[in-house]
Amino acid sequence: MKIDYLTLFPEMFEGVLNHSILKRAQDKGIINVNTINFRDYSINKHNQVDDYPFGGGQGMVLKPEPVFNAMEDINHNEHTRVILMCPQGRPFTQEIAQELSEAKHIVFICGHYEGYDERIRKHLVTDEISMGDYVLTGGELPAMTMTDAIVRLIPGVLGNQASHQDDSFSDGLLEFPQYTRPREYKNMSVPEVLLSGNHAHIDQWRHEQKLIRTYEKRPDLLEQYPLTEKDREILETYKKKLKND
């Protein structure tokens, strides 16, 4: 996968891209990343990339020329996913991360200032994506977050490719509780089922815990999850237990 970042602050990406999983993915040749300072593509003698909005208003708007010129230098085609980091976009989810992990080429447009000239949005962008209902100074941090979520899903990136399959949201539920040694710590014990060696019982316990944890922390996710009759029984039993406690 090729990943290009159009940004005014390419140095922001150095720390994230040069450590941990993203560094290993580059070392393995699985991803090829490139940061492009679109200020270098300004047609203004002062390298200006923003200007006042037509019609008046607060803040500055990102000019179209630097971004269009930078995109012309990128070897992209109709299959390239050009992502605009934008609070107006669709919320980023694990499902979107999985979808984008199958792309061959992704371009992140990371803006600053009040907003983008609408012609950038209309004529260059394939996807507008938001990290949530809040506003950040620029698109760099969201682009880094998305990159981490996407790249770890590409086959060969993780040491154990199955390790992401139990992550929260991978199947629509939150992840089950995890334990490691010691078996007991400060009078807190590991659930006996995890020590039993009975994998069928362990799988059942983990599924129950995923349902319960999702009900406790993100009940909205259950509205979209295809609950079985057994799942409903588990949740009803848990709700009754809460009432009795």
Swiss-Prot record:
Lineage of source species = Bacteria, Bacillati, Bacillota, Bacilli, Bacillales
| Known role | Specifically methylates guanosine-37 in various tRNAs.
Q: Which residues bind S-adenosyl-L-methionine?
A: G111, M131, G132, D133, Y134, V135, L136
GO terms for CC? cytosol
Main subcellular localization, coarse class?
A: cytoplasm
Annotated EC = 2.1.1.228
Q: Which domain of life is it from?
A: Bacteria
Identify one Pfam family in the record: tRNA_m1G_MT
Protein name (Swiss-Prot/TrEMBL): tRNA (guanine-N(1)-)-methyltransferase
